[in-house]
A protein has these predicted regions:
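Structural and coupling elements of P-loop NTPases
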Residues: 1-418
Length: 418
């Protein structure tokens, strides 16, 4: 999703043609990054507006569209009987509309002609913004009427920002384009399970556990991959966020929590916990549930005590060996190190407890004690460490903490030199 497209109009004030080149350059940069980071697992899926996996949006103005949804809207407004998918395929790239023959060609009809994306999408969008910002009620009212939108007289008395948001939402409607993009390009949980399990499960692939996970079987053995810990409002304990790959997790259920160091030969990194509560996230809200079947993302209370980064949850009794889901992998390393100590030495235990919570909350943070007794924190960069220190001071330890000089680790210098 390309957000803040409206800033090309309101802040950068780019001409429509330049805005098109900016958007195209951004997508090319994204595809270059995808290609450079891609693995053999699942192949490489590049973003392309014609394919329908790019959504243009503005959070401030409350609109979003794909080429397909915009083409459908355009044909509906103008009463044209034509396949919107075919029309959408002609709205990107070096294609030009020839009004005489009413066809799209790679050759422009005249010198200086605009590409189809500029002519059919950007220019109307620019016109809407210029009319609303111009604060000429008559012009806005007549133009919106052409688009089949009627606003109340009270709406035209609003300030520019709320009026623009109301006008754009009335024109573009609900986020059907974004929803259609998700439905079309994101596979269902069951369809994606086999590829996912091959990639993240560390055990043998011919076991009955793997078979149940690949089928997303709600009646199979419980297997949950915990990937993130979220603090409670008082930051005293955490709730575990994970995906149920097989089985059904329920409140009151006793489970085994396997840490990142667990293996069937070494069961030291394992604890037994009871699931006390379950929720599903809906934006910033939590909805309490009693159970969650395979395929669900669920928030779990009561199992966080032994989890540091990620974990695997499995049932108490199972006939075969259970292996863990592999820990998360990142393209960056925590190479920037700072030393921290409490301003008041007597508050050291509080800071140490806060550092433990920081390690649980930040996936790429590493906290350790040096041989000198110094407490150090490693992060990916200055901004990352700033966020860590803010949370350490205000949420997790609630003590004054002073920081020694920041420096890069030997590992980072090695990468720079080479």
């Amino acid at each position: 999703m390309l957000l803040q497209v409206d800033r090309l109009i309101t802040e950068l004030k780019l001409p429509p043609n330049d805005a098109y080149f900016k958007l195209r350059h951004t997508l090319e940069a994204i595809n270059d990054l995808i290609s450079s980071c891609s693995t053999t697992v699942g192949g490489t899926q590049l973003v392309d507006p014609v394919a329908g996996n790019v959504c243009f949006a503005s959070g401030a103005a409350g609109w979003s569209f794909t080429l397909q949804s915009f083409a459908h809207l355009y044909l509906k407004i103008h009463g044209i009987q034509f396949d919107h998918e075919k029309f959408a395929s002609r709205l990107w790239g070096d294609l030009y509309f020839h009004p005489d023959s009413r066809t799209f060609k790679k050759k422009p009809p005249k010198e200086g002609a605009n590409r189809s994306f500029v002519e059919f999408i950007l220019e109307p969008l620019y016109k809407i913004y210029s009319l609303v910002v111009g604060e000429q009620k008559g012009n806005v009212e007549s133009k919106l009427a052409e688009l089949g939108v009627t606003l109340s007289n009270a709406a035209y008395k609003l300030n520019v920002r709320p009026l623009l948001r109301l006008a754009c939402r009335s024109i573009f409607g609900t986020a059907t384009g974004f929803t259609d993009m998700l439905v079309k390009h994101i596979p269902s949980v069951k369809d994606a399970a086999a590829r996912k399990i091959d990639h993240i499960y560390t055990g043998p692939q011919d076991s009955s556990i793997v078979d149940a996970m690949k089928k997303c079987d709600p009646n199979g053995p419980l297997m949950v991959n915990v990937t993130k810990l979220y603090p409670k409002s008082d930051c005293s304990v955490f709730d575990a966020f994970g995906r149920v790959y097989s089985g059904t997790i329920q409140t009151g259920q006793t489970v085994r929590v396997l840490g990142e160091g667990y293996s069937p030969d070494d069961e030291e990194d394992m604890t037994v916990k009871e699931v006390t509560k379950l929720w599903v996230y809906q934006a910033r809200y939590r909805v309490a549930i009693s159970k969650a079947p395979a395929g669900s993302w669920v928030l779990i209370e009561g199992v966080d005590a032994s989890i540091m980064k990620t974990a695997t949850i499995c049932p108490m009794n199972i006939d075969e060996d259970v292996y863990i889901f592999r820990p998360l992998r990142f393209n960056t390393l925590p190479v920037v190190k700072i030393a921290a100590e409490p301003l008041n030495p007597s508050e050291l235990p509080k800071m140490v407890e806060g550092l433990r919570k920081i390690s649980k909350s930040y996936p790429l943070a590493i906290t350790k004690v040096e041989e000198s007794g110094e407490h150090t924190i490693l992060g990916t960069g200055e901004l990352y460490l700033d966020s860590i220190m803010k949370d350490l001071r205000e949420l997790y330890s609630e003590v004054e903490v002073k920081v020694c000089m920041m420096h890069f680790t030997t590992l980072s210098l090695f990468f720079w030199v080479n």
